Structure formats: structure tokens, C-alpha cells
């Protein structure tokens, strides 16, 4: 029997859909799952795909060099699966990890398998269940030789916008690193949109239907994006039992899988400010403290000015500008961190290509990526695209609307940590002088840490108490 083109391990919904995507594009596919029941269920629905029930049978079903795609839960499950494969694979075979693995884990696995002559690729896959089936965004890192064995098939199953939304992004953990940044930006944008929803419903007292109409208008202009599209879908859904908007019945306790936290932690490690992403992570942490928040609301007798007249008549226009500016800043922080990481980890990430492939298939696809792509085409070494003239002009135009929104939120007592952090970041980034001189003076006084001067070179220390 002729060997299968690709093998997929892990038959969760994402794994099943990727297997079908490969099959729909003309590739012969073999699958394996840790539990036989899941494999049998899938095989019953899709007999054209080869079902296997042991790892040796799975590996022997594949043509050489073998191409194995893992879609298992990130962490120990990936290591366990790799451990079961290593004695069965041969030099030159390719193993692709399509889960949300932490990039240092990918670096380690890549190094370990390289010693065995096996190419290990960290493959970031974005697009959710539908993207996995119809065309995701695919971010690949690892040995280039390994990518050369699978690049064509990955291009074919990827979303297609200005070419395949699949790109080789660099060695070792580069692919999973870029996927981590993608997820950090995703956290930030979701939080910004949620804050807009909160302001409109709590301070503006708009109905869910009215907010949906506002978002629809925004999505027809510069805020056009996948996340805005699904925000509209969420607001359209009615609970069949109560006939109320389903979103209003959902407990306000947001969960997270950790990729946003990884982004913030890495930003701290590299010394790159990402306050909007940080605020989004912290906001989910705060939401988890539901019982404490209820107690605090009662003990402090929290009162908010939620009357509709507390917001100006053209507030939705101002808020649109603030949301747009905050989303631009969210992307800017992510790309800035990516730039620092690319240099620090010697990835050589092609930022123009990252912006391009994010335009299709992925969760953060948005109209603004066209402008981001143009910025990097004009200057491939741009540290932060807020330095690009087009973005500088855009944020200047949105400045007043941004500030008016923050002011209205403060007066209404509605927290907008991500929008607020975005504006603070923008003001800080464009400040020629910050109060760090005062901080350095304090550090020198209590800890003799020294300081630099603006009028002459060198490191200085003063006796502040004499």
C-alpha cells in the first residue's frame, strides 16, 4: 500500500478539521488518537482517511520522509507524544507541533530532535475550528530543511489572501513565538472591544441591539476586523429560554489559557513595554475575583453615573476613535516586542510577511494590517511602527476623541484599563522627557545606584543627605 502523505495525531475538533483540510486539498492522510473511541468515531464518518490505533502502525502508514502533524494539548502531552515517536521515526522525518506550545519548550524539543536527525517545527495555527477546516493562518519556525519538506502542503491548506497565509518565520521557536505575540495582541483587542461594550451599555445605557448597530457601523469603516465581526454575532444571539440577549446572561468571569500571560512575561524579560496587553491579562485576573468584587461593590457603596446624559451626544463617534487608536497601539506593542525578540533570539522574523499572513485565516485579521504591512515595506527595520508617518498622522487625528473617551469613562466610573493603558503608552512613547530622572535620584539616595547626567558623560553618585 502506498504511504500516506501526512499523518495527524490528536483528534480534537482542531485536529479533525486539519485532517479534513489536508484531505480536501488532495493529500492522503493517516490519523491516530490516544483513545481508540475517538479514532473509531472519526473513521466511521470519514472512511477515506486511514485510521490507525497504535503509534507503530501510524508511523508505518506514512511515506518517507514522514510528515507528522501533532494537534495535542500543549505541555506534557506533547513531550509524551514525541517520546513515543522518536524510536519509530528516521533521520530526515519531520514532526510539526500545531498546538499553542510555549516557545522555550519548542526550542528545547527542536534541539533534542535535531540530535536524532529529526526536523521539529513549531507551527502556530490561528483561525479556530473553522479556520482549521477552511484555511488557517500558519506561522512556522524550525529548521529550514524541515520546512522545505512540508512548505508546499502547508501553503495549500492555509487561508489565501495576497498569497498563502503561511510563512517560514525563522529557526527554532520562531513560529510559536510569533503565535504567542498574535495571542497577546488578541487579548488586548478583545479587552478594548469589551470596554467599548461596557461603556455603551453601562454609562450610555444602550441596549444590546443598539450596541450591535454601533459595532456594525464601525465594522464598515476602519475597524473592520474578524473580532468586530464576531462581536456583532455575539450581540445578535438570543437565549432561547429567556428570549434575552445571551451575552447578558453569561457570568462575567473570563478564563484564559496563559498565552497572554506568556506575552507579558516575555515583554518584562526583554524590557519592552506592552501595557495594553498587560492590562488585558490583568483584567481577566480581576474578573476571576467575582465574589470579592461583589463584596467590594457593597462595602464601598459603589455608585456610578450611568445616566445617558453623562455621555455627550456624539459619544459613539469619539469612542470609535478611541477604540481604533487603542487597537493600533495593541498591534504596535506586539510588533515592537517581536522586533526585540527577533534580535535577541536571532530569529530574523520578516515583519512584513507577518503582517501579510495575519490578514487571512487568523483571529486578529483586520483592515489595519494593510497599513502595518505598508509601514514595514517602507522600512523593514522599523523598531516600532508608531514611528511610521502614516500611523503618527492617524493617532494625531484620533487624539482628542481618545482623551474625551477616557475622561467620560472616569466620570462615569466605568473601568477601561486597556484603552487607558494605550493612551498612557502613546503619551509616554512620544515624551522626550519622562520623570525617570527623579526615579534615578531616589534610587541613588537610598541604594547608591548611580545616575547619568544630561550635560556630561559618565556615571555619577551624590551624597544626597549632606
Language-model features and meaning:
Residues 29, 51, 120-121, 274, ...:
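Hydrophobic beta-strand scaffold residues
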Residues 67-84, 99:
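Glycine/threonine-rich flexible loop motifs
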Residues 173-176, 201, 206, 213, ...:
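Interdomain hinge/lid region at the active-site interface
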Residues 343-375:
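Small-residue-rich helix-loop
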Amino acid at each position: 500500500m502506498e504511504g500516506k502523505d501526512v499523518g495527524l495525531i490528536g483528534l480534537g475538533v482542531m485536529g479533525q478539521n486539519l485532517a479534513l483540510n489536508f484531505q480536501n486539498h488532495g493529500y492522503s492522510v493517516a490519523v491516530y488518537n490516544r483513545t481508540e473511541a475517538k479514532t473509531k468515531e472519526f473513521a466511521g464518518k470519514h472512511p477515506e482517511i486511514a485510521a490507525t490505533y497504535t503509534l507503530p502502525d501510524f508511523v508505518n502508514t506514512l511515506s518517507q520522509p514522514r510528515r507528522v502533524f501533532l494537534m495535542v494539548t500543549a505541555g506534557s502531552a506533547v513531550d509524551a507524544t514525541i517520546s513515543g515517536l522518536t524510536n519509530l521515526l528516521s533521520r530526515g522525518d519531520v514532526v510539526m507541533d500545531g498546538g499553542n506550545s510555549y516557545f522555550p519548550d519548542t526550542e528545547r524539543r527542536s534541539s533534542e530532535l535535531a540530535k536524532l536527525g529529526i526536523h521539529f517545527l513549531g507551527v502556530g495555527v490561528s483561525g479556530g475550528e473553522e479556520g482549521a477546516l477552511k484555511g488557517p493562518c500558519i506561522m512556522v519556525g524550525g529548521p529550514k530543511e524541515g520546512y522545505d519538506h512540508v512548505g508546499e502542503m502547508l501553503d495549500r491548506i492555509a487561508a489565501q489572501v495576497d498569497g498563502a497565509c503561511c510563512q517560514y518565520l525563522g529557526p527554532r521557536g520562531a513560529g510559536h513565538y510569533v503565535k504567542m505575540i498574535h495571542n497577546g495582541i488578541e487579548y488586548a483587542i478583545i479587552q478594548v472591544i469589551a470596554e467599548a461594550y461596557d461603556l455603551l451599555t453601562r454609562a450610555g445605557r444602550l441596549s444590546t441591539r443598539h450596541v450591535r448597530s454601533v459595532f456594525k457601523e464601525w465594522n464598515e469603516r476602519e475597524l473592520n476586523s474578524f473580532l468586530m465581526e464576531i462581536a456583532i454575532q455575539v450581540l445578535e444571539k438570543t437565549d432561547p429560554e429567556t428570549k434575552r440577549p445571551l451575552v447578558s446572561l453569561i457570568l462575567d468571569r473570563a478564563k484564559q489559557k496563559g498565552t497572554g500571560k506568556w506575552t507579558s512575561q516575555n515583554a518584562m524579560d526583554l524590557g519592552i513595554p506592552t501595557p495594553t496587553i498587560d492590562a488585558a491579562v490583568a483584567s481577566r485576573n480581576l474578573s476571576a475575583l467575582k465574589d470579592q468584587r461583589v463584596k467590594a461593590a457593597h462595602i464601598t457603596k459603589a455608585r456610578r453615573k450611568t445616566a445617558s446624559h453623562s455621555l455627550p451626544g456624539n459619544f459613539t463617534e469619539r469612542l470609535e476613535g478611541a477604540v481604533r487608536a487603542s487597537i493600533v497601539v495593541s498591534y504596535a506593542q506586539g510588533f515592537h516586542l517581536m522586533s526585540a525578540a527577533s534580535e535577541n533570539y536571532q530569529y530574523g522574523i520578516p515583519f512584513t510577511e507577518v503582517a501579510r499572513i495575519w490578514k487571512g485565516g487568523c483571529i486578529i485579521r483586520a483592515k489595519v494590517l494593510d497599513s502595518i504591512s505598508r509601514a514595514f515595506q517602507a522600512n523593514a527595520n522599523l523598531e516600532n511602527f508608531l514611528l511610521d508617518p502614516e500611523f503618527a498622522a492617524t493617532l494625531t487625528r484620533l487624539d482628542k476623541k481618545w482623551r474625551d473617551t477616557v475622561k467620560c469613562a472616569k466620570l462615569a466610573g466605568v473601568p477601561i484599563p486597556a484603552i487607558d493603558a494605550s493612551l498612557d503608552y502613546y503619551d509616554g512613547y512620544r515624551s522626550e522627557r519622562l520623570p525617570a530622572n527623579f526615579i534615578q535620584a531616589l534610587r541613588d539616595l537610598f541604594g547608591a545606584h548611580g545616575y547619568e547626567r544630561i550635560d556630561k558623560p559618565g556615571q555619577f553618585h551624590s551624597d544626597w543627605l549632606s
